[in-house]
Regions:
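A short, glycine/Asx- and small/polar-enriched loop/turn
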Residues: 13, 40-47, 89-96, 251-255, ...
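Helical element adjacent to the flavin cofactor pocket in flavoenzyme catalytic cores
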Residues: 51-109, 117
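Short, solvent-exposed loop/turn elements at beta->coil junctions and helix N-caps
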Residues: 37, 85-87, 244-249
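C-terminal lid/capping helical subdomain adjacent to the catalytic/cofactor pocket in oxidative enzymes
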Residues: 30, 35, 77, 95, ...
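Short loop/edge segments at beta-strand edges and connector loops
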Residues: 32-33, 81-83, 243
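Dinucleotide-binding Rossmann-like beta1-alpha1 core, especially the glycine-rich loop
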Residues: 1-39, 192
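Active-site substrate-recognition segment that forms the wall
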Residues: 104-105, 114-244, 248-263
Length: 323
């Protein structure tokens, strides 16, 4: 994939991003305008640099989820449809879960991997984690021939994705009409992502909005997305959009997921808050969470993801757990 830069500020963002990726052993580099146009002949001449990784790839999340489901059921998973936990109680070193279907389950461990709804599960224990839904609106195009060799993101999309809550958004992009449109784009958390699919449709996004559980799409935001993609890829001016949709990402204030056993609640584990990286990080999250549940030391440090960082000031956790 590529993260494209339109100006020197964007290049600085990309340089920091690439340096971080390289420190972790990932094969990512910055390429010049000539190489960009070899990969993407339709991109605007305003793009001056880009990140590039030949190892970047994408998956269909629905097929991935189906694969996880089939693999897990083959190993003994029981999947309960149309049921939700209504109470969650520690009982003599185990957990009792009462479901909306009237069924009661007993287990030694509970893993809260409920995504944007994870805090609702925590609420059953009197806990509160700042895991909140962050809406993303997306345009879907008609089927097209391939427009380039990779998926494309803007430097500002990376900033929007990684920027912790409360940090000012980037300024006006060159395609915006002025400060008012820049303000609206900042309110929507606008970033640029241009992703092809195996069927030939392109997904164009996206916003990052703190809008609760509202998944409606907004014409004003969609219009900004359309204008933005035409700026990066002028060939898109005559392309038809066939539908729109919005989804929810489970976000945290510091941009890090919450992974680990909750202090004071033995056997209750968090694995949520990955925002838009949940699909990419699902295999490793499953592995380290399984290690924790089984009492093994994970291969990787989970220090940055500790649940404790969000629990200060929430009273006596041991008393809450025993209650």
């Amino acid at each position: 994939g590529e993260g494209v830069a339109l100006g020197l500020v964007d290049v600085a963002v990309m340089e920091d991003f690439v340096a971080s990726q390289n420190r972790h052993g990932l094969a990512v580099e910055i390429v010049d305008a000539r190489r960009i146009r070899e990969l993407h002949p339709h991109v605007t001449d305003r793009v001056i640099a880009s990140t590039y990784s030949a190892r970047d790839s994408q998956v269909n999340p629905m097929l991935l989820m189906k694969g996880f489901f089939l693999g897990a059921t083959a190993k003994g998973l029981t999947f309960l449809r149309r049921s939700r936990p209504e109470s969650l109680s520690p009982r003599n070193g185990r957990w009792e879960i009462k479901l909306s279907t009237g069924e009661t389950l007993e287990t030694g461990s509970v893993v809260n991997a409920a995504g944007a709804w994870a805090n609702e599960i925590c609420g059953l224990l009197g806990l509160e984690f700042p895991i909140a839904p962050r809406k993303g609106q997306v345009l879907v195009t008609e089927q097209l021939p391939p427009l380039g060799a990779t998926n494309v993101w803007s430097a500002q999309y990376i900033v929007s994705k990684l920027r912790p809550a409360g940090v000012p958004a980037p300024g006006a992009a060159p395609w915006m009409s002025g400060p008012e449109e820049a303000r609206k784009a900042a309110d929507f958390g606008l970033g640029f992502a241009f992703t092809g699919t195996h069927s030939g449709n392109y997904l164009i996004g996206s916003t990052r909005e703190n809008a609760g559980f509202d998944k409606t799409t907004v014409p004003e935001a969609l219009g900004l997305l359309a204008r933005q993609v035409i700026h990066y890829f002028p060939v898109m001016k005559d392309v038809h959009f066939i539908r729109t949709f919005a989804g929810l990402r489970p976000s945290t204030p510091d941009g890090m997921p919450v992974i680990g056993e909750v202090p004071g609640f033995p056997g209750f584990f968090m694995a949520a808050g990955h925002e838009g990286d949940g699909i990419a990080l699902s295999p490793i999250t499953g592995r380290v969470t399984a290690d924790l549940v089984e009492g093994r030391k994970p291969e990787f440090s989970l220090e940055s993801f500790r649940p404790e960082r969000f629990l200060e000031g929430q009273g006596d956790l041991d008393e809450a757990a025993s209650g």
